[in-house]
Amino acid sequence: KGKTLLEAFEILDHFQAYEYLLKNLDRPLTEELLKETHRLLTEHTLSYKTQYDEIPSNPGEYTTVDMCAGDTIFGDHEQLIKQVPRLLQSTQQVLDSGKIHPMIIAARFHGFYEYLHPFRDGNGRLGRLMSNFILLKKEQPLLIIPGSQREEYITALKYIKKERTDEFLIDFFFRTSIKRMEQEIEEKKNLTENFIRGMEFVRNVKSSNDDISEI
C-alpha cells in the first residue's frame, strides 16, 4: 500500500534474488551465480526502467555501454567487465583461507564491485546482496543500511576512488553492523522486560482472585 509500481517490482525482485542466494550458500562466488542473482534482482525492474531506451538491456547480462551513477563516471565498460571474474575468484580464495574477518572481505568486495559497475542497472542493490551473501556464508549477521545512513554510505564508496583506500567503507560496514546488533539487543531487552511485567501482572491477578475466593 502506498508503493509505486517500480517500488513494488523492486521489492518482489529483491525477495527472489535474496531467496536464491539463501538456497545457494554452499556455492562459490562465480560469474554464473552473479549473473543469475542479477537476473532475478532486475527481472521486472530493468524492463520497466529501460522500456524507452534506444539501447536494449536484459537482466543477467553485462552492460554494453560505459556507465555513470550520479556524478561518478566509470571507465571503459569492456575493460571493467574483464576484471569481474578475478574479483570473484580472489574473494572466494580469501574467504576459504579464513585469515581475514568476513566483514572486511564483504566491504572490500562491495567497494571493488561498485567500481566495476558491470551491469546496466541494479549494481548497488546487487553489490549489497552479494556482500550479505559473503557474510551469510560465514554465519555473520546481515548488513542492513538504513536510509538515514545513505549519504554516509555513498561518501564511503566515493572515498575509494578519491583517496584510493577502502578503510572508510570497512569502518562503515563494521559500525553499521554493530549499531544494528545493539538495536536488536535493546529491542529484545524491552520485549523481555515487558514479558516479565506481564507475568507479574498475571500472578498478582491470580493471587487477588485466590484471596477473594477465601473470603
Functional labels for PLM-detected ranges:
Residues 1-121, 125-215:
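FIC/Doc superfamily catalytic core
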